[in-house]
Amino acid sequence: PKVKNTERFFKSLVKGDYYEKLFHQTDRVRREGFAALNDFYLLAEIKTLRYVKTYVMIIEYIEGIELVDMPELSDEVRGKIKQSIYSLHQHGMVSGDPHKGNFILQGNEIRIIDLSGKRPSRQRKAKDRLDLERHYGIKNNVRDIGFYLLIYKKKLRNFLRRIKGKEKR
């Protein structure tokens, strides 16, 4: 939305180019040997200072079945999804949105698409794990500081929403 352009402009001055970070992170992780994520071939941008006005990304086409097109997921596939996200975290990246449309079953392997170029904080990793539980029923067994920060942040937001007379999320 246009109302967010000013916010994005100033954020880019402080944090830098989101798409370029994602491009470099993906390249680094693939060079480290983690090949589950899709590859980038080209990133072309039109910028004002560090703010990206327009961009074009050419990414790897992954032949396979999107998990959203599978009526049921086997325990084996769920295990591979969990392992792919945990490996992604070990390599210093987060998914940011691990729903069924962002995974492709290619042969017998899980591939991850539509990644986040955001900093892999403990809270973002915890959010990935909780999203796996919500979308796939994959139990989150990690109760670290990121998990508790995320849970209490959500509780605080819901409390403030109730005070304002809004529905909780």
What residues fall within each predicted segment?
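Generic alpha-helical structural signal
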Residues: 23, 79-82, 126, 130-133
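A short, flexible beta-alpha/helix-coil linker loop
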Residues: 6, 64-67, 118
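Short, solvent-exposed loop/turn segments at secondary-structure boundaries
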Residues: 13, 70-75, 123-124
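Conserved kinase catalytic-core helix
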Residues: 19, 25-36, 65-101, 106, ...
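C-lobe/activation-segment region of protein kinase-like
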Residues: 105-169
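Conserved ATP-binding subdomain of kinase catalytic cores across diverse folds
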Residues: 1-62, 90
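A generic fold-level signal
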Residues: 51, 98, 124-127
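Histidine- and aromatic-rich ligand-binding microenvironments
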Residues: 57, 65-68, 134-136
